[in-house]
Every structure is written in C-alpha cells, then in structure tokens.
From Swiss-Prot:
GN (gene name): mntR
Origin organism lineage: Bacteria, Bacillati, Bacillota, Bacilli, Bacillales
GO MF annotation, one: protein dimerization activity
Residues at which Mn(2+) 2 binds: E11, H77, E99, E102
Annotated source species: Listeria welshimeri serovar 6b (strain ATCC 35897 / DSM 20650 / CCUG 15529 / CIP 8149 / NCTC 11857 / SLCC 5334 / V8)
PROSITE patterns with a match to the protein in the record: HTH_DTXR
Protein name listed in UniProt: HTH-type transcriptional regulator MntR
PANTHER family: IRON (METAL) DEPENDENT REPRESSOR, DTXR FAMILY (PTHR33238), TRANSCRIPTIONAL REGULATOR MNTR (PTHR33238:SF11)
Keywords in alphabetical order: Activator, Cytoplasm, DNA-binding, Manganese, Metal-binding, Repressor, Transcription, Transcription regulation
Subcellular location: Cytoplasm
Database matches in SMART domains: HTH_DTXR
Entry keyword annotation includes Ligase: no
Highest taxon, organism lineage: Bacteria
Binding site for Mn(2+) 1: D8, E99, E102, H103
Amino acid sequence: MPTPSMEDYIEKIYSLIETKGYARVSDIADELFVHPSSVTKMVQKLDKDEYLIYEKYRGLILTPKGTQMGKRLLERHALLESFLSIIGVDSSHIYHDVEGIEHHLSWNSIDRIGNVVQFFENHPDALEALKAMETTKPETNE
C-alpha cells in the first residue's frame, strides 16, 4: 500500500494526466508546492513500486496499477468533498478538511460514506431535513 505522501503524488499525477494529457516533474512540483528534486525522488520511488514508469528527461507515464490507484484516489477525494458539502461544511473549509482526513479513513469507511452520499442524492427530502437541522443550531468558528 502506498504511503499518504505517495497517494498525494499518485492522485496529482493522475489528475494532471487527465486534464493536460501529461505530467512533468515541474508541473507536479508546482501543484504540490514542493521542490522538483523532491518530486524526482518520489517519482523514482513510485517507479520502483511499479505505479509509474519514469525516464529522466523524457517524462513519466502511469502503469495500469498507477492509473487504477490514481482514479480511485481522485474519486475518494471527490466523494469526501461531496460528503462534507452535504453535511453542511462551509465550502471554504472543504478542501483543507478533505486533505486532512482522506489518508486516515479505511476503504470500508469510504464505501460507507459513499452510501450516505448516494442516500442523500436519492432522497432530497432527507437532505432538506438535514439542512433544516443545521439552521437551528448556532454556528461555531472552528
């Protein structure tokens, strides 16, 4: 299993390839706010663990294993954003909160959260009842 840091890189590489068609070391560094040398070290580790194929000065491509993992990680991120939005978390906090929790949940927990999201998507009346509960409680600034 990849470490949380490896997951961040795989997710970002997958996202870049999906949007731009490629992922360069400099693009990854810019997106993750790290030095290119840090990206190179991680890319070499991901190559060794068969998540991608990296050739110095030529770029990188995700292996089927890396593509599958990247897709799953991006879906996990989107699901958690949806969940936090549904339960009424302020949109200015959602990205940061997802980044803080996504690596600490089991895939079983992610699947259960997916069930909750799907339930509220299929039952708008229940979603309205949830939102009504939120408007009756005082807001905190934490």
